């Protein structure tokens, strides 16, 4: 692997908390909540029936209805986020060598809304009434493929399916593709649209969703997370190339750690040894010390064991210095856990936090567990200089990922 430095030069976010970056960041620092009862279909029989929902997607304003009707909502959302990331980066895709542009996206569930409708038609009306676009609309690689088709991208491509860690790994693969010389620029991120009957059922059967509709990680009465739909896509680029074209640089991708618990298909290690190793690998890879981390966006899935394990991992790595050296925030409590897109959304928040000197923290935690000593920062946005950010993901199957971004 070369010593090339890799940076983020464009951001696109489509979320329940907004799409335009200024609006999105203002919302996640204001404490405004975007979780609501699901009314897209009858969710009354589900144990968990709340979500972060994008009220007005308006994909037809940017893309033709002829194309959109062939795609699932998770592709619609990803197309918008990718378009925003490209525009934000200032890169003219048409003038680039498209064989040197990559695209790597993650998701956890695929396009279930489209698939469910076609399965209902199959059951009620028969095989002849199923959409001919079924085969290309639902499968997990559809957003990656459609974005590459839309912009003529012909370089390195990959779709990552690794539960909540999916977009974390997409960002890492993007950085590796650039360091290894396989691409000059890469669109990297994730997308998810889990607010459909079967997708919601799958999430409910995991046992990880909040039954109260409250997403309150590290709270004494935490009972899981609330899902959300959305996408975040980052333009990832080699640093010298970015500087040469006068690009705005949000952050450098400096470290990444990826481990497995090897313990349970659905549960999480309450000791947190796997995520602790991932964090250490990421920090060591960045060439810094734990004290140099100023802002932490934990996985914070709100489960009894998952939060316990992550809290122990943070304590083992940072010790008593944690509260003094770093702010800890879980802004996704406002708009939901975007599953396979959550890591990329957190990375977008981290970039904006470094640029603005403001760290969004955690809302909705009314009774923080006092065993963990960062409770003083719940419910407020912290103004501070931020040089390095650490972002964690913990997925089902014991997948752990930690990413470190540094200010340039």
Residue ranges and their predicted role:
Residues 5-9, 32-36, 213-288, 294-295:
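Condensing-enzyme catalytic core mediating Claisen C-C bond formation in acyl metabolism
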Residues 1-3, 89-104, 117-132, 149-157, ...:
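Structural signature of cysteine-dependent C-C bond-forming condensing enzymes
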Residues 124-131, 169-172, 176, 192-245, ...:
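Glycine-/small-residue-rich "gating" segment that lines the acyl/pantetheine channel
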Residues 8-10, 28, 82, 103, ...:
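Conserved small-residue
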Residues 1-67, 89, 240-252, 348-363, ...:
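ACP-dependent fatty acid/polyketide chain-elongation machinery
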